[in-house]
Design a protein with these regions (language model features):
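Short alpha-helical functional segments enriched in proximate histidine and acidic residues
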Residues: 110, 127, 183
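A short acidic, Gly/Pro-enriched loop at the edge of an enzyme's catalytic core
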Residues: 90-102
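A short SAM/SAH-binding and catalytic strip from SAM-dependent methyltransferases
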Residues: 101-115
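Class I (Rossmann-like) S-adenosyl-L-methionine-dependent methyltransferase catalytic domain
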Residues: 1-47, 52-91, 115, 119, ...
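A short glycine-rich, Lys/Arg-flanked "PGG" loop and its adjoining helix->strand segment in the class I
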Residues: 118-130
């Protein structure tokens, strides 16, 4: 698989074409997201990295800010009154120590190489407060039997999107758990919680120094 430029033509470009269809078909908020949000104090400031159509930014009592690299998604979010910026998760346009929590739900797996993945983790860590947390989810190799998503290998994958009979190919990277754990450790993030839900690997992360007090 030729990965040169794949984040542009296999992620950003594809989502720009399917954004309206995605928006109309992806309105449900996963139960595990709702459960995590119950534990986040009211008044918290949260950044949703790769926020898409903003479906996870509509909880009462918290201040959400979003980031996405797809202009069409940013426009959809703004039309709903959500505070969203256009940008890259490897260069997050927010100040250091700005947020109580960062959420990156089903977006980190679109990064195509190790340096960009580590840079994105560093950026997420940079913008959370010393006692802040990161909630990160990626698609799992282990998918439910009822799903049409079946992965034959870890690493680089193409997953199709059917928009009224027209097929679009999206890039995904399917991680080994050990691979993610090594990256978290190298960047100075501690896993507070890890669980699987509906084909997703979900991690709740804290800065290592949070545990060194």
């Amino acid at each position: 698989m030729n990965l040169e430029g794949i984040e542009d033509y296999g992620v950003k470009n594809i989502y720009s074409k399917i954004a309206p269809h995605f928006n109309s078909s992806r309105t449900y908020v996963w139960q595990w997201v709702k459960d995590i949000m119950k534990d986040i104090p009211k008044g918290s400031k949260i950044c949703d990295i790769g926020c898409g159509n903003g479906r996870n930014m509509k909880f009462d009592g918290v201040n959400f800010y979003g980031l996405d690299n797809c202009e069409q998604f940013v426009d959809i979010c703004k039309s709903q009154g959500l505070k969203v910026k256009l940008g890259d998760m490897c260069s997050i346009p927010f100040n250091s120590f700005s947020f109580d929590a960062v959420m990156s739900i089903a977006s980190f797996h679109h990064l195509s190489n190790y340096p960009r993945r580590m840079t994105a983790l560093y950026e997420m860590k940079r913008i959370i407060k010393p006692n802040g947390m990161i909630v990160l989810s990626v698609w799992s190799f282990n998918q439910p039997k009822k799903t049409r998503r079946v992965f034959s290998n870890y690493g680089d994958n193409i997953v199709t999107w059917d928009q009224y009979g027209k097929i679009y190919e999206r890039y995904y990277y399917i991680f080994r758990i050990t691979e993610l754990k090594d990256m978290f450790n190298d960047i100075g993030l501690v896993i507070e919680k890890h669980f699987w839900d509906c084909g997703n690997e979900i991690f709740v992360l804290r800065k290592a120094e949070y545990y060194e007090k």
